[in-house]
Each structure stands twice: as C-alpha cells, then as structure tokens.
C-alpha cells in the first residue's frame, strides 16, 4: 500500500468534486444567499467540499460558535422548524434560510442552508445620541432604492431608522444589498405606523420568476420561541419557505421583529395574495400575538392540527371569561383547571361554541340569521343535556358552558375577525349577568352597569366596566409574579373592576360623566426579575395591544364600528375616558393618547388623562399621587419644608 499516493488521488478527487459542487451552488442558489454569506467564506468552502455527505447525513454543521450557527441539510417539510426546536431557548438575533432551486446532484433533494445568530442588543445599547459613521455611498443607494421602490416613504425618517438598524447589526447592513435594506427600513416604518403589527403579502419578480414575499413586522414580540411559532404556522399550512431573512432588533425601548419570507406551496406553486390560503396565512401569523405556545390549546390542538391558531385563541378567551365570571363568587367550587378541562377535555363542546360564535360574528357569513338560530338551539340542547354520570363535575361544567353561551349571545361586537390584532376585545350587553344565576353575582353591587368589555391577550386578561354611556375612570394593571398570584388575581378581577367602577360612579354623581374602571391581570409568573426589562416589555405589550383592541371596537363611523370586519349589534358611539392608575407608566399614557388620535377615536387624545399637556391629574389632587403632590407643594410654599427631606411634625 502506498498511502501518500492514495491520499493524493483522494485529494484530487475531492478537489474535483468540490469544484463541481461550487459550480452547482453558484448556479442554483440565490445571488442573495452569497451576499448573506459573504463573511462566511470558510463555511461556503466546507459546503462545497462536503455537500456529497448529505446522501447519508441529515445535517452538515458548517459553523458552530457561541454567537453563530450555520447548518446545511436536505430540504424537507418542517426542516427549519425542526432546527429551531433543537436550538431551544437561545435568543436568535438573525436568521437566514435559503434553498436551492434544483435537487443536489446525485442526491435527489434540494439543499437548504440555515444561518442563525445569537447576538441580540439590549435596549440600553441602542443609543441614538451616539455618533456612528454610515458610509455615504450606502446611504445614497438606500435612499435611491426607497425613492424607486417605496415612493410614499417619508425620507426624513431614513437617517433615524437606518441608524437603529446599524446599531443593532452593522455587519448585516454592510453586507445586504441596498434593495433589502430599503424594504427593511420600509417594513420597520410600516410596523411603527400600524401600532406595532404589520403584514404584507405580494408577488415579486426575481430573475424572471415570480414568487410570494411575506413581510412581517412585530413591535415587542413574544420573547420565547416566537420564530419557532411563526415557522409552525408555515409548516401547518403546507407552505414552503424558499428563503427568509429575519431579525430581532431593539428600538431602544423594546424588541422589534422584522421578517421577510419568500414562500410557495409545497409543489412550488405561487400563493396569490388575494387567495384563501394567503388570507389564512395572514390570520394565523397575526394570531401568534395572542395564542401562547405554553398553553395546552396550542400544544395539544394547534400543533397537532386539530384547531387553527385563531380558534385556539378563542377557546382560551372562553376559558378566561368563564373563569373570571364564575370563580369570584365561588372560588372553592371553581378552580382554573375546572374551566380548562371543560374545554380541553371536551373539544366537541368547544367546537359547538366556536361555530356559534363564528356564525354570529363572521362578517362574510351568508344566511346568518337562519344558521345562527339553528346552531344556538343545538348548542343550548347540548349544554343542558351534558351528562357524564359524574354529578359534581357535570354541574360545574354545565355552569361553565352556560356562561360561555351567554358570552357568545350577549357579545355585541368584537375585533376577532380583524386580522391585524394583538389582543381580543368583546363588548357585552350587561343583561347577561341577570341570567348567570344569583349565586354568581351575590358578591357584587346590585346596580347594573351600562357596558362590560372583556379583553384577552397572550399575557393576561381583564375588563372595562362603565355605569353610564359617557364614563371615565382609571386603568390599572395587576402584575402577577407567580402562578398562584395570577390565578388568585384573575379569579377576583371582575369583582374588583365592578366594585371600583360602581364606586367611581357614585363619586361622579355631580358631573355629567358616569363612573368606570379598567383593570387587567398581567401574567409575569415565568419571568425571573421583578420589575426588570422583560417584565416592562411584557407590561407594555399587554397594555398597548389591548389599547389597540379597545380602539378596534370603539372607533365608529355614523354610529357603527368603522372597521367593516366588525359585526356591530350595538350601533352607537361610545365616548369612554380612561385615566392612569397602578402600573400605567408615563410613556404608555402618551403612546395611548397618540394612538387614539392617529386612529380617529371620537375623543382623540382625550381618551387618556395625565398627558404632558393639559391638566395632569397626578399633580392636581385627583389621585393619591396627586394628594402627595398637593402636600409637597403646600408644605414648600407655606412652611418652606421639603416633604421628602426635611423633618417636621404634625399637631
């Protein structure tokens, strides 16, 4: 045996194979792929040398570092999804996926390359006052691309948005073609303008081929497994991702997800933006803001293809409403698990109620009155006939199903069929309370309210209750930092809001505005640090998402909900004023007021008190904070005493 000769022959064969593979890669991978991999030449060389090993291996690891992972694999249904599941809870800052347009020679399957980076910037690192040097030539090219591709874009925003992207990932901006940077800036701006949620599907041309591009922007996205959840949507809908570029950046206040997906059907067919599949994709992508991956509805029903994400979010809203409606009066009889098992263990009952809800509120429903009447009779019969032979459990579950039935029949309008939503809102006729049963309302004041609105979000739920048409009152958020705290707070939140709103109504007896109150429970039980950055981001997501949902249903035109995807059984304007209360930070006050004005609510910025302009009721004695402020001012002016530093006595 002449080993050196064998090695030389093997090396020659490997060199020839690598050159052939390199030529194949050059011809069958997107030009954008090579731009995205410009800083990974060793990984590209390794791919050319080793590509043939994919005949017998599922993956080739091309780069494996603390902050970067590059993998080559055989393209197959769910391959991206499987990789992200293996990555686990590592925070992804950048993800790039790209497929070949032809099967690999001698293998018979397409090539897929996945690049993941784990280098997220924290909010405090994005300092817009910091000087950065963005190449003038790059700035000119991006500006020209924006003028050409997005003529409506306000170019005065370019410097600020590009600087944010640069501070987050300078290397990506340097390597990206100006066209990609331009649409990234446009997408970032659209996300901001749309209240933190924007989705665009369009057919685009590339090298003479049309393909479907999905652009998705999410302000303050869910932090755990969000990209995995998005890929689960594509996988479940049998949509193939040909290539994708996704970033999670920080705007200095909270994270921001910016994603571009180039997709097709599993057989390579285009997905038309106005088609049924595209509509379903839009709904499911936006529902990722509402359905949590940790819930049983998601894990056992959505992932398994038994429920859509939309329907699962509705089931979770059913559970939250029934829990908050029944448990406050009888906490020993009704625990959270009783409501969960009523729906999760009996999906046939959940499906009946989902169908009834859809028949009542689907804006495109034909023959609504007849079909809804039939479905209502069927649902009522199923609820009353529910019997498993376990009397104690049957009584509990019938009470739960009756409550849910009242929820569906007494909701007057909802934003459920609005696609671009971050939370669910349900405006109810309070008459349902009289039908709940005396045992469930014995612990609340007898005076019936004028309106009840229920809100449900990925991270919490709560109510707004008003005792007159024109009403005002504060908005407080209870932060539950343990599972026990959340269950306890959620169990009593309805009674708390009801009593506070009724008390406010009595206080307002001498003015034209009736009393109201809004309170939410935030689930922060899985977060490590109380009051930390992650908790604040979640608090802002809950509040801003529910503010948007509030405006979805209460913005009207000629007395009807302006958004025609909302079936409105109430049909009148509802001027509701909100004041800040517990855990409503100054920045959120300004954000909600600005959002209300931009979206065209009847009260404009008047929706929220204690803004920077006008009379700030935190400073003028309307709240406990205001009382302290009054005391500070009085002591300083009358006695020359600094209430916070100087010793003093009261006589």
Place the predicted regions along the sequence by residue:
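Glycine/serine-rich phosphate-binding loop and adjoining beta1-alpha1 elements at the start
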Residues: 497-649
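Positively charged, amphipathic N-terminal segments that serve as targeting/anchoring signals
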Residues: 456-460, 464-469, 480-491, 631-647
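Non-catalytic interaction/regulatory segments
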Residues: 1-239, 243-458, 477-490, 534-538, ...
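Glycine-/proline-rich flexible loop or hinge segments
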Residues: 473-483, 519-527
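Duplex nucleic acid-engaging cores and interfaces of nucleic-acid transaction enzymes
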Residues: 409, 469-473
